[in-house]
Amino acid sequence: MKVTDVRLRKIQTDGRMKALVSITLDESFVVHDLRVIEGNTGLFVAMPSKRTPDGEFRDIAHPINSEMRQEIQDAVMKVYEETDEVIPDRNAQSSDDSEEA
């Protein structure tokens, strides 16, 4: 399985979230709401998640092996580094501050 498209929107927020991302896999399946997060050791790609009733975050889609995780990370970060435009995002949720780094 290959990442065949990355759509990325850098955003300006007070939190650690730096971009919202959608990826296409094998030109056949789209995953929305990935995020580029500023962690303690640098930027990383967080998978789409939802808050559970106990306040924790749980991924709703994620790779099941390290090779696919690395492919997603590499593809997203390549586009992130190539994107200059930053959009102020008034609707960004501050939930990114509770993500683990």
UniProtKB/Swiss-Prot annotation:
Keywords: Cell cycle, Cell division, Septation. The keyword Disulfide bond does not apply. GO terms for biological process: division septum assembly; sporulation resulting in formation of a cellular spore. Could be involved in septation. PANTHER family: SEPTATION PROTEIN SPOVG-RELATED. Belongs to the SpoVG family. This is Putative septation protein SpoVG. It comes from Staphylococcus saprophyticus subsp. saprophyticus (strain ATCC 15305 / DSM 20229 / NCIMB 8711 / NCTC 7292 / S-41). The gene is spoVG.
